[in-house]
Design a protein with these regions (language model features):
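A compositional/biophysical signature of low hydrophobicity enriched in polar/charged and small residues
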Residues: 1-78
Length: 78
């Protein structure tokens, strides 16, 4: 069974939409929506393991230009 998580992203001012578009192209990302509030983009992602999820966030998501901070929240039950 795959692991599902939400990744909450803060971006540089005015970069939410472009970050969401770029993150949506990453393998394992189900949705990437630009939103209002303390976070600018909320991502729903899946991976085979916690290790794979961490690698995706660190090696792919966090490399997108305009991201200043991420918070990964694994789903407990789905």
């Amino acid at each position: 069974m795959a692991l599902r998580a939400y990744v909450l992203i803060q971006t540089e001012v005015g970069k939410g939409a472009s970050v969401a578009t770029k993150v949506a192209e990453i393998e394992g990302v189900i949705t990437a929506d630009d939103v209002t509030g303390p976070y600018d983009v909320i991502v729903q992602a899946e991976a085979d393991s916690v290790d794979d999820l961490g690698k995706m966030v660190v090696n792919s998501v966090q490399l997108v230009e305009g991201i200043t901070r991420t918070l990964t929240c694994p789903v407990v039950h789905f």
